[in-house]
Amino acid sequence: MEELEILRKKLYSIQRQDNTQKLSERNCIEIIVKMIDLKMIDIIHSLDGKEYITPKQLENEIKDEILKCGGRVVVCDLQSILSIDIIHIEEALEKLKKRDKSIQIYQGEIMTRYYLDSILQEIQEQLQEVGKLHINDLSNRFSIGVDFLINLIEQNLKKFNRSLNNSTNNNNNNNNILLKNIIFDNQEVLYTQSHINRHYHKVIGLFSSITQPILINNVIKQHQNHYQLNERLVRQQLQELIENKRINGFIQGKASNAEFIPTIFSQSRLKWIDSFYHQNQFITFDSVSKLQINEPQSFLKNTFTDGLLLHSCFIHKSLIDKIDDNIIEIIENSNWLDLIPLLPPLTDKDISMIVSNCPNMKTNNAILLGNSFIISKSFVDRCFTLLQKTIQERMEKQQLILENIASSNIKKQQQSKSEIIDQKIETTTTTTTTTQPSKKKDNLINSDDDDNQDNNKKSSKGKNKKSKQQQSSIQKLINDSEDDYKVYNKKQENNNNNKKVDHLKEINQLLSKWYENMEEELVESLSQYLRPLVNQSWESMVKEAKEKLENETQKQRKQQLQQLNSQFFSLYNSFLLFRKGLQSLNDADDDNGKTIIALEKHLLKTVGINITNLLIEINANYHMLDKTTFETPSERSLILSQFPPQLSKSFEKLIQSLNKSTLNDFIDSLENVCSQSQIKLKSLDKKLEKQLLIENQNELEEQFLNEIDVGNQFQIIVNLMYIRYKNNYIFSPPRLIGKLVSTLVMDTSIDKEIITRLTKLHQEIVKLITNNKLSNQDNDNDSTELNDHIKFFKDLILN
């Protein structure tokens, strides 16, 4: 530095001299920069570049500036004050901090120890004046962060505490301690010990005068303006006073709900609770809560060991023993008990809990009803037995009524259908031109053909025995009636499913009738208890009856299906027999097949329709439809709509084939439907054909003996002659019977006398019909020749 000073002086003297050769400022700057680069000198230039300063001088100037500012200065302010770049200032400050521990930097500010000590000294002086200071107020006052200020205060307090613990060094350290006898509460408030003592005595005075429970927060708010109480300090000191028994009482609750309860109040309260409990054998939680006890359940449980906690009250166990003794009595006598007179005014839930704690209730020999009645199980069982017997009698009566109704309906339908069956049997093989057609189920195809006049005179069993036809028809009528009854039952079942039978009203009435002295509330409660049992018993009875009826119905349906199948095959075999007869007649047809076409149409309109209807009924039974029979085309269409789509279409084709003139389309459609219905069709063999011919012949002979109408007698004679000599049966309407006569006349194997008499008989019949003399055959038929011919054929047939 001395050399530098010498050089500076030389430079100054040279510059002062008048010389023609002088260095410019630029040259001087370049020389200095070169010397700095060569590390010949260590200097720092100012911000304007016109001045230079050494690092040592910079440190000195920083110290001077700190002293000038009272020990606290902002680092950024030094740049403008010293006109030195901030980087050089920060480097100089780091060196200063290492050498001088009293200097520290906090949030961009330089603070010295003596400055911080002055702050602590000022805090100490102010505390002695006011007694307490808040840390936030101090932070705002000194413009220092709260954390830094807290740390500063705590360090000083730690030194003070260590000095108290170390008495040997106490005198040496007291000089460095500025805060003495200070309490720093929760790093928020500074108190002097004298202030704490004054606050302590305020708490003693306030809470010693309290005789009623009061919230601690309310005490603080009421006396805040006058005593300036601190909530946290009050709680802490009050707890300490209670523990030291300086104040008689206790704190109940926490935080803002903390409540001070003086001992004098708790003692009088406990005395009242004890007196009420032992006099009444119970006490409610509400009454205890009104005495400012926050947890009455825990309080009562800890206070009285001979009681039981319920939902809303606390009772003495002697009440349970009293109720239990009465329960034993009603169990032994099969009676009931009303609890209301035996108990204090309790809630339903309390009574239920009392009953559940009775030992005899755990044996399941008694039950609680209506929340206040105990009734023995044996008494309940007796009531249920009586009710069950009553509803069983009711069920039997209803079942008997239904059976009578169903039986009556069946008898009526049997009677009506028997009349129809008899009419069918009479018109199966014998018709006259005067017979009026009747509307029947056997003919559901509308046609303009004249054959419709004769459709009603043919039945599905026309070629079987009369007795078999009657039995099968009557059995079918019975099955139809049972189907109707099943439909009724299904409707009833659907109604029952939608709305189940409830016997509550009936149970209530019966119990009131049987036990007149029983309380109305108990009657209602017992009815509600027995209600599901009685309803379930009723439902089981109904279910059992339904299952029985369903089993019978299924059995009947199965039998009916078997009968329908038997009828179908019998009718189908007759159809094959009639078809074979038409084929034999085809060879002798001499009118271009018109007669054959008419006979085939007649066969389709009669036997074909019956086969179709019978097949629909078989499928309706197979698919378990509610309605299996029908009387009109609309009813038949409704049944077909419930079949599977493919089967329904096949039936539509079968019905359409009935309106055609040939049998081939009908047979093809019939085979298709039978294949889908799992019905196997068989051809007519010789043995069965012969059997059918014999049966039809015997039936015609029997009808001939009982027939008095001449026209019908003639038709029977022609059919019998055709069966005898042609071994075939032609199913012909009356208007085409002449074709059969012509065929027989052309047969050379028949005796000429028979042919002659048959021809004359035909002529007489035609003559009578033409002259309208058959209107009253019993009185008007006086033709001797006609009677002679008929007598001849009668003898021939019978022999």
Swiss-Prot record:
User: Domain of life of the organism in this record?
Assistant: Eukaryota
An annotated GO BP: response to endoplasmic reticulum stress
Composition skew (Basic residues), residue ranges: 458-468
Q: Which InterPro entries match?
A: Ufl1, Ufl1-like_C, Ufl1_dom, Ufl1_N
Q: Look up the EC number in the record and give it.
A: 2.3.2.-
Pfam families, alphabetically? E3_UFM1_ligase, UFL1, UFL1_C
A GO MF annotation of the entry reads: UFM1 transferase activity
Alphabetical UniProt keywords: Transferase, Ubl conjugation pathway
Q: Which GO terms describe its cellular component?
A: endoplasmic reticulum membrane
Record field: compositional bias (Low complexity): 469-478
Where does the record place the region Disordered?
A: 429-483
Functionally, this protein is described as follows: E3 UFM1-protein ligase that mediates ufmylation of target proteins.
Q: Which family does it belong to?
A: Belongs to the UFL1 family.
- Output this protein's name: E3 UFM1-protein ligase 1 homolog
**Biological source species:** Dictyostelium discoideum
